[in-house]
Amino acid sequence: MFWLLAIFAYLLGSLSFAILLSRLTGNPDPRMSGSGNAGATNMLRLAGKKLAVLTLLGDLCKGLAPVLIAHLAGLSLQQQAWVGLYAVLGHLFPLYFRFRGGKGVATAAGMLLGLYPPAALLAIAAWALTFYLTRTSSLAALIATPLTLPLLAWQEPEALLPMSVLTLLIVWRHRGNLRDLFAGRERHF
């Protein structure tokens, strides 16, 4: 059952709402325009609030749904977390879009919401506060994601290993943003 759900999660995660919505509405491919990221923040820059919100909700749901299904199937919390990670991997490396996807932040938030809602709320609050203070989405993601690890270690240690892997993946996907942050070139809203 685990591997079936992991494959389902990867295939679901491979649906890029940013790319699909941009194609449906005649907007530029987010991988080729703006920041080059197939995610909600770049959709906000390229296509406006409505499509950005739809992208955000779609990406959240594709992280949340596999975790909830894994829970209903009776998988352990750690297995649920690994299933959720496969959804994020689908977002990062989508099968349907030549393995060029987004950075996984919204999909990871959906995954975390399904695993342990208090950690998701902590991450969302940290992201919102950091974004409010800095107007920099990448910095907000880089602060919010690792902040969940101590809470998970304390409350849900079974999920710590998959969430640590997730954190490393998100930091790795933001490596260009980190270079730009340190060089003072990162984009702000």
Curated annotation (Swiss-Prot):
Highest rank taxon of the organism: Bacteria
GO cellular component term of the entry, any: plasma membrane
Principal localisation: membrane
UniProt keyword GTP-binding, yes or no: no
Pfam family, one: G3P_acyltransf
GO BP field: phospholipid biosynthetic process
Keyword Lipid biosynthesis recorded: yes
Pathway per the UniProt entry: Lipid metabolism; phospholipid metabolism
Membrane topology classification: Multi-pass membrane protein
InterPro entries to which the protein is assigned, alphabetical: G3P_acylTferase_PlsY (IPR003811)
GO molecular function per UniProt: acyl-phosphate glycerol-3-phosphate acyltransferase activity
Catalytic activity: an acyl phosphate + sn-glycerol 3-phosphate = a 1-acyl-sn-glycero-3-phosphate + phosphate
Subcellular localization: Cell inner membrane
Signal peptide, first to last residue: none
Key words, A-Z: Cell inner membrane, Cell membrane, Lipid biosynthesis, Lipid metabolism, Membrane, Phospholipid biosynthesis, Phospholipid metabolism, Transferase, Transmembrane, Transmembrane helix
Segments crossing the lipid bilayer: 1-21, 51-71, 77-97, 111-131, 151-171
Record EC number: 2.3.1.275
Subunit and interaction comment: Probably interacts with PlsX.
Function text: Catalyzes the transfer of an acyl group from acyl-phosphate (acyl-PO(4)) to glycerol-3-phosphate (G3P) to form lysophosphatidic acid (LPA). This enzyme utilizes acyl-phosphate as fatty acyl donor, but not acyl-CoA or acyl-ACP.
Family, similarity comment: Belongs to the PlsY family.
Name of the molecule in the record: Glycerol-3-phosphate acyltransferase
Species this protein is from: Pseudomonas fluorescens (strain ATCC BAA-477 / NRRL B-23932 / Pf-5)
Annotated gene: plsY
